[in-house]
Amino acid sequence: LKKIKIEEALIKVLSSPNHSNKNWITNQYDQTVMCDTVQKSGSDAAIIRIHNKDKAIAVSVDSSANYCKSHPTSGGKQIVCENWRNLISVGAKPLAITNCLNFGNPENEEVMGEFAECLEGIKEACEFLNYPVVSGNVSFYNGTNKKNIFPTPVIGGVGLINKLSIPIGHIFKKDKSNILLIGKTFGHLEQSCFLKENYSIEDGMPPEINLHNEKNNGESLLKLIDKNLILS
């Protein structure tokens, strides 16, 4: 691979439609109807206050077509865990999910295989995290000029925040605060936005996911947030 300056690489990633600011879309809609919005879109999850209660619900919607195309089973697990993390990151206990399963022509054996494997990954992650699927729908025959779309299951999750004082955002609150990394990093570059945007490389496998670690990390973070030990 050719050498690239980190500043140039970052600009390319942030300039991509997949990673750039989405405010031009969300600002066209009223996000504060009935004055119940605690946290708008743009953070890990949106938060809405429950009427006459010192509680709120958090909502996050997630997908990863690239992961699901490269390894459908792993991709299915990845998007459930991403959704799980996003809710926990704002102080919400994940309760349940719905899904929208978007795929190409099921008469194509490869597409049907992707569908079955994605479902297996979603099922495995949901069962392990005790994160039930309460509803969903399937959309087949998506494509253009006989070219099927990537397998694109979308997960929408809802979590409960027990106190309105709990929700946390993604913006730093105080100078000189400690920054903590929860979990391990493995330097995995395959299927990364860095390779795709800077080198047009979309090969390889998504990073491995350990459901035991996901659950332990998530539950530990929730405890820290409940004890007011996390600022953002």
Q: In which residue ranges do the predicted regions lie?
A:
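Glycine/proline-enriched, intrinsically flexible loops and inter-domain linkers
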Residues: L1-S232
